[in-house]
Amino acid sequence: MSFFDSYRKKMQMPSKEEVLPGRVQPIPTAAAHFVSGHPLKGPWPDGMKQVLFGMGCFWGAERLFWQVPGVYVTAVGYAGGITPNPTYEETCTGLTGHAEVVLVVYDPKVVTLNELLALFWEEHDPTQGMRQGNDIGTTYRSVIYTFNAVDRAVAEKSRDAYSQALASRGLGPVTTQIADAPDFYYAEDYHQQYLAKNPDGYCGLRGTGVSCPIPLAH
């Protein structure tokens, strides 16, 4: 396979015939957040809400959100594909269909979804399709997965507002997928809160420099 063919393959979602089979049992992961000590899989306090963000390599994306006041816990994992309970190595092949994502569990009385969305839009480049900077492939695509119709509408409205802001600077179009939350598979313990354990580790987050104009209250 030529370099061009290999690159093109990385940028395409796998067919059902190509996807890896995965497994029935979940991949072992950490029980508690390395920074906060809160349970990664719950139970969480009443009133907490959830959203999944994919914005390239999940190491830097997770650190971005666990630092936000009002975010109760974060976890990295895989979502949006077909393979059940994939490993990191399997996901990196591009043959699971999954994106690297961050689960953000937050208190809406302290931080709004719009505030989280503003960080999402500003801290990565949502116009790059199946890549994020030097991280190339469907695994690194930009996604927002919401857990109810109201939150999905809020996310779509924020996308429209940010699209206009980008267009005014000659940038775009936005390629971010917004959809109802699919199954979320927790990544291995090694990847959870990676940049807290490895402060000098890789972080590929790079924004466009365009501010998000959406109202922060919702």
From Swiss-Prot:
InterPro entries: Met_Sox_Rdtase_MsrA_dom (IPR002569), Met_Sox_Rdtase_MsrA_sf (IPR036509), MsrA_MetSO_reductase (IPR050162). It catalyses: L-methionyl-[protein] + [thioredoxin]-disulfide + H2O = L-methionyl-(S)-S-oxide-[protein] + [thioredoxin]-dithiol; [thioredoxin]-disulfide + L-methionine + H2O = L-methionine (S)-S-oxide + [thioredoxin]-dithiol. The keyword Oxidoreductase applies. The active site is at C57. GO terms for molecular function: L-methionine-(S)-S-oxide reductase activity; peptide-methionine (S)-S-oxide reductase activity. Keywords: Oxidoreductase. One of its GO terms (cellular component) is cytoplasm. Signal peptide: none annotated. Its EC number is 1.8.4.11. Transmembrane segments: none annotated. GO terms for biological process: cellular response to oxidative stress; protein modification process. Belongs to the MsrA Met sulfoxide reductase family. Has an important function as a repair enzyme for proteins that have been inactivated by oxidation. Catalyzes the reversible oxidation-reduction of methionine sulfoxide in proteins to methionine. This is Peptide methionine sulfoxide reductase MsrA. It comes from Brucella canis (strain ATCC 23365 / NCTC 10854 / RM-666).
